[in-house]
Design a protein with these regions (language model features):
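Alpha-helical transmembrane bundles and membrane-interface segments of multipass inner-membrane proteins
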Residues: 1-159
Length: 159
């Protein structure tokens, strides 16, 4: 069975896989560049009045939640990332196009952060968005993809 015949037999794969791998690869490459550029030695780079590049190790999940959870949380979040990604893949034939796109973004981001947890025991964050003195918690490409994917998923359900 060739790849093209597999794609034809599994509806949505031709959209899911490119988006999934684009998110995953962009996330991992950006994190490696940031590890080399701003993590060792730690330094801060101002990009403009709204954006900085900063070195942040996140041992929890979004916004640093569950950061003190230790090994159990790390394992749980990693298992959850693979479970959610597997669910999206399994559900592909039943999903609408926008949901496939959203699922691919969420899965790619989830696996990107899971790879960090497996490699480092924590996640590499480096994007610091701020308005004046108010700073959004540092995030990465995977987090952005998960957030965009969740927004697209919600939109697909509501409209």
């Amino acid at each position: 069975m060739t790849m093209s015949s597999s794609i034809q037999k599994w509806p949505g794969l031709s959209l899911f896989l490119p988006v999934f791998f684009a998110v995953l690869i962009a996330d991992q490459i950006s994190k490696q560049i940031m590890l080399d550029l701003v993590f060792n030695p730690p330094r801060y780079i101002e990009i403009g009045s709204l954006l900085n590049i900063v070195p942040v190790w996140n041992s929890g999940m979004s916004f640093g939640m569950l950061a003190d959870g230790g090994l159990i949380v790390r394992i749980g979040l990693t298992v959850l990332a693979f479970a959610v990604s597997g669910w999206f893949f399994w559900m592909l034939p039943r999903l609408e196009r926008l949901q496939r796109l959203a699922g691919a973004a969420i899965a790619g981001g989830a696996i990107g952060n899971a790879i960090d947890r497996l490699r480092f025991g924590r996640v590499v964050d480096f994007i610091d968005f701020h308005v004046g003195a108010w700073h959004w918690p540092a995030f990465n490409v995977a987090d952005a993809a998960i957030t965009i994917g969740a927004g697209l998923w919600a939109f697909s359900i509501l409209f």
